[in-house]
Amino acid sequence: MEMNEKGMVAEAIGSMAITLLVWGGISENAAPHDSAVMAGAAGVTLAIMWMTFRGSEILPIITIGRMAAGHTEWQQGTLNFLMQLLGAFVGATVLAWQGETVFEAAEALTATSAATALLGGFLLMLVWDRLGGGWEAGAFVSVLLVAGVTLASASSIGGTIADGHMADTDNFIAVFGTMIVGGIGAAA
């Protein structure tokens, strides 16, 4: 496996941008994360990052899905995933340093949330594969978020680590479980 330094930086910066610009909006005057405004912000931010860093995945669901489908070698996929986590951790640490709340407990992984993550991952990968990472995929992320599909991102893990909530096993299982199930759906 050949190291792709530019690709590694793209994954980290993209994930950090999502963490800072979308999750960084948590304050008493910001729109709640389950609102259409935040879904739109997430979609636009992802679209811009995907267009800026062509070929980057940025979302662990896409990375896991591409590894499971055999489109990405496991070594490269693992490196992409780790760089996404690093970028999210750096972004969450900056937010925590500013005094922002960066940790929100994830809901327990239920059969319903697993099914929606599976279908959401499948649909997102369908759009991403056919149209590429761009405004179309970003707009579709917004639609999925407005519909209530949980797209556990590296930001969720970065916030958990930065706020010192790693001992909350229910949250950790919910975030990783949603990510893995979404990745399996993306591989279908």
Residue ranges and their predicted role:
Residues 1-188:
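Membrane-interface helix-loop junctions and terminal tails of multi-pass membrane proteins
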